[in-house]
Amino acid sequence: MAKEKIIGIDLGTTNSVVAILEDKTPRVLENPNGKRTTPSVVSFKNDDIIVGEVAKRQLETNINTIASIKRKMGTSETVKINDKEYKPEEISAMILSYLKDYAEKKIGSKIKKAVITVPAYFNNAQREATKTAGRIAGLSVERIINEPTAAALAFGLDKTDKEQKILVYDLGGGTFDVSVLELANGTFEVLSTSGDNFLGGDDWDNEIVKWLIGKIKLEHKYDVSKDKMAMARLKEEAEKAKINLSTTSTTSINLPFLAVTDSGPINVEVELKRSDFEKMTQHLVERTRKPVRDALKEAKLKSEDLHEVLLVGGSTRIPAVQEMLQHELNKKPNHSINPDEVVAIGAAIQGAVLSGDINDVLLLDVTPLTLGIETQGGIATPLIQRNTTIPTTKSQIFSTAADNQSEVTINVVQGERQMAADNKSLGQFNLGGIEKAPRGTPQIEVSFSIDVNGIIKVSATDKKTNKIQTITIENSTSLTEEEIKKMIDDAEKNKEADAKKKEKIDVTVRAETLINQLEKTIKDQGDKIDPKEKEQTEKEITNIKDLILQDKIDELKIKLDQIEEVAKAFAQKAASKETSKNEQNEDGSIDAEIKEEDPKA
């Protein structure tokens, strides 16, 4: 009987990737668009849920589109769509379900199990939320592993006979982690981990966005930050500019008709130099330096002890990031693996280990933060120190703080601060029925255990009566079992109907994007367009709208193929006439263009 496959999923802030091991060789699975990475974006349109490339294209036009939901995992925040509130786990489940569906089509069999990666610095609530998202998507999450650990697995799969110490620098879309691992005799042991859950490639994009907002305000006296659609376009162009500046010294940012004011349309055309980009983001690069030093210190290593420095996450392509790291560690980072795919590949390898397809690899991960309980005076008393190898169990005896105390409250905290209030409370429970006695007399054993997924269980036992109270620390904001079951059932019920809707959604989105472009051109440039062309275009818009209303998808596809190229030429012609007019003065003369170099540009 064939072993059941376990896929590996990198559920990223910006993009997600799914991989599998076939014949002991990792394979990244392409999505329906032929891409190996899928945007972690979900869009709601009427009753339809759209994920990935098509959803990302709607960021500009559809306010019911959600990106970077990973930043909210493990929190009580919700997103409101059409009068319904969704928890982060639900949105993430939609992404996971999409990945699962196309993976099944690629390998030709059902998938029930997955290994999902999380940032090393994800706390317990965030890990539980990730497991919950997997369950809603119909996946049994066999293991949650840290992203840097997964990267090291991918790098070291064919090097298990060599003893090496590896530093993994993982700069994702929304999180940043550094881990130090030791590889020896097929064992991958995490020695330390450090990072920042609120730093990622998005922050580099945002610096460009802020720069553009300032330029537009200065030149056009318009605050574009209050225009949602314009901001979506700015963010998309900022990301493109960041990517371009990794390989070129200068990039152009062109945003025609970004907005329309009383003075006319705002057209943005600026150049951004890599040197200026590096100045505006230098503070972000510097924020990554301390976690690198902390991880080495925790591992009791120096930079010269490292054999390899691995780069993970698309933003590690930024030259300033690589230069800082090389200068800090006096070692050139390893570029041999694709930073966008390596985490999913590592997760797939761990899946193969769990399924028995790989037998000579052992992964020993660590807990990223100290765990303890609140004791008298609000002190955080640690039981399991950060960077302890998991799974692990630790017990300690405590007592009462007052005479004749019959009940104690156990407040479980996570963090490195001395006072419990300064750390994150993961949950609390009461142990009652304690026999009356002077303070300090009763013996209460508190035990912590952390499993391989980093999920925590805590128990308190009265040693005299053997009365015990146990809690599994779960995300205090997570969904109830009933809610999770309902969502799983709903997802299964709607699966066939959703599949039938997919083609309709893709074609309709294409059509509506085209309509928006044409209507905007007519609205902004109508007086400059030939009346016959304008009339013909308006008729075509009406025809397309009618086909959408009548659900005539096949006819709509044919119509779109015919008109898209015509529409492009139509928009270019209108823009050309506007440019010609703007270059003329009122007396009919045309000024020569004079460029003045802006030292801040």
Curated annotation (Swiss-Prot):
Upregulating conditions: By stress conditions e.g. heat shock.
Pfam families: HSP70
Biased composition (Basic and acidic residues): 575-584
Matches recorded under SUPFAM superfamilies: Actin-like ATPase domain, Heat shock protein 70kD (HSP70), C-terminal subdomain, Heat shock protein 70kD (HSP70), peptide-binding domain
InterPro entries with a match to the protein in the record: ATPase_NBD, Chaperone_DnaK, Heat_shock_70_CS, HSP70_C_sf, HSP70_peptide-bd_sf, Hsp_70_fam
Residues modified as Phosphothreonine: T175
Region Disordered, annotated ranges: 570-601
S-adenosyl-L-methionine found in the keyword field: no
Gene3D superfamilies per record: 1.20.1270.10, 3.30.420.40, Actin, Chain A, domain 4, Substrate Binding Domain Of DNAk, Chain A, domain 1
Composition bias type Acidic residues, residue spans: 585-601
UniProt key word NADP: no
Keyword annotations from UniProtKB, A to Z: ATP-binding, Chaperone, Nucleotide-binding, Phosphoprotein, Stress response
GO terms, molecular function: ATP binding; ATP-dependent protein folding chaperone; unfolded protein binding
Family per similarity comment: Belongs to the heat shock protein 70 family.
Function: Acts as a chaperone.
Protein name: Chaperone protein DnaK
Organism field: Mycoplasma mobile (strain ATCC 43663 / 163K / NCTC 11711) (Mesomycoplasma mobile)
Higher taxonomy: Bacteria, Bacillati, Mycoplasmatota, Mycoplasmoidales, Metamycoplasmataceae
Gene: dnaK
